[in-house]
Amino acid sequence: MSIKENQLAELAAQLDKCSSCHLRNDCQAPVGWYGCPDSPIVFIGEGPGGVEDDYGCPLIGPSGQLLDKALWSVQMTRDRVLTSNIVKCRPKGNRTPDLAEADFCAKIWLERELAILQPKVIVALGSVAMHYLGDPAMRITRQRGKWFKTPQGYDCIATFHPSYILRQYGHAQVQAKWDVYHDLQLARAKAVETCPDYNLCSEKPVDLFAEFQKRSG
């Protein structure tokens, strides 16, 4: 194992035991991260949903399946990037985590992940991730597709969360998909610019359901 892999394994063992806030009371277990620690690009969503809680993998449900298709369209695959979330435990009823919950959890876990990973590019999936990594005053409809620096100095670009696209219909959904495609192209280009020798795409998309077993209980 590489140094990063060892450090993430130690962090994952600590995460499994986390009971620092009330969100832990309503989920099966915390959900960590997935992907390659050496990737120059990290995708950060808001938090686990029901399917993610069942399987212990971020973005494995309908939103994650749409993300996989979007990544494939710009020659990236989930095993060659890294995906994580702002909060690690599923909020009750799959609700959106509030700012206080996001801030509390991310400062304990996400900040330590990023300190290990040192990504060249971060893609904030949706408003929750964008607000934490950027500014709570930002609006996703205005900020998406534009670069900004996180407080820690990482280059970050925001785009719509896949769940937002799934809630759209007709022309609005088509437009949102094109917007995300454009944003992912920008993110990929910067990742390639910073790490030209890193391969962002495997020969075929990863089947996460074949890789992860459903949790019991």
Labelled PLM ranges:
Residues 1-217:
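A polyanion-binding, active-site-adjacent surface
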